[in-house]
From Swiss-Prot:
Taxonomic lineage of the native organism: Eukaryota, Metazoa, Chordata, Craniata, Vertebrata
Modification after translation: N-glycosylation is not important for activity, since deglycosylation does not change its PLA2 inhibitory activity.
Assembly information from the UniProt record: Heterotrimer of 2 subunits A and 1 subunit B.
Protein's recorded name: Phospholipase A2 inhibitor gamma subunit A
Keyword Glycoprotein: yes
Keywords, ordered alphabetically: Disulfide bond, Glycoprotein, Phospholipase A2 inhibitor, Secreted
Main location: secreted
Disulfide bonds: 3-27, 6-13, 20-48, 54-75, 76-81, 99-124, 117-146, 150-172
Record keyword Signal present: no
Family matches, as Pfam families: PLA2_inh (PF02988), UPAR_LY6 (PF00021)
Organism: Laticauda semifasciata (Black-banded sea krait)
Single annotated GO MF: phospholipase A2 inhibitor activity
């Protein structure tokens, strides 16, 4: 199988077709949006993916302090695989739970704050790793926050970029209940 491969800021990118390695049997498009108020940016990634990563379909992480990270994964059997657009953000109220919150880029050791969970968010996610780019050093990242359900991610998930994206931690736990102050 061959798929379009490209990465860019925004909603589109110039792609080239490349052969995929097993077990990456599907073409896919990943849209990412990262917002740390008042700054927000989106990126697009077209690539070869394993069917296990395609099953993830979407993720939404509430990092707290009006910050979030969300992604949409759309896979198909054709070389050209257009992604789905982001819907508007849902309006949801705090639900009495909290998690550690971090959006750490360029470091795996970031200072934590409390992320107040909203709506159906009752789980805490903790993801850390390194992204290898054509820079003098790897880009480290550490993301913690509230999620509605635990994604089926593990350290063994392979993508076409296995040599460029190194997950070192994937944890999902129950959120803590806020104890009302007297």
């Amino acid at each position: 199988r061959s798929c379009e491969i490209c990465h860019n800021f925004g909603a589109d990118c110039e792609s080239r077709a490349e052969e995929c390695d097993s077990p990456e049997d599907q073409c896919g498009t990943v849209l990412l949006e990262v917002s740390q108020a008042p700054i927000s940016f989106r990126t697009i990634h077209k690539n070869c993916f394993s069917s296990s990563l395609c099953k993830l379909e979407r993720f939404d992480i509430n990092i707290g302090h009006d910050s979030f990270m969300r992604g949409r994964i759309h896979c198909c059997d054709e070389e050209k695989c257009e992604g789905l657009q982001f819907p508007g953000l849902p309006l949801s109220l705090p639900n009495g739970y909290y998690c550690p919150g971090i959006l750490g880029l360029f470091t795996v050791d970031s200072s934590e704050h409390e992320a107040i969970c909203r709506g159906t968010e009752t789980k805490c996610i903790n993801i850390a790793g390194f992204r290898k780019e054509r820079y003098p050093a790897d880009i480290a990242y550490n993301i913690k926050g509230c999620v509605s359900s635990c994604p089926e991610l593990s350290l063994s998930n392979r993508t076409h970029e296995e040599h460029r994206n190194d997950l070192i931690k994937v944890e999902c736990t129950d959120a803590s209940k806020i104890i009302p102050s007297e």
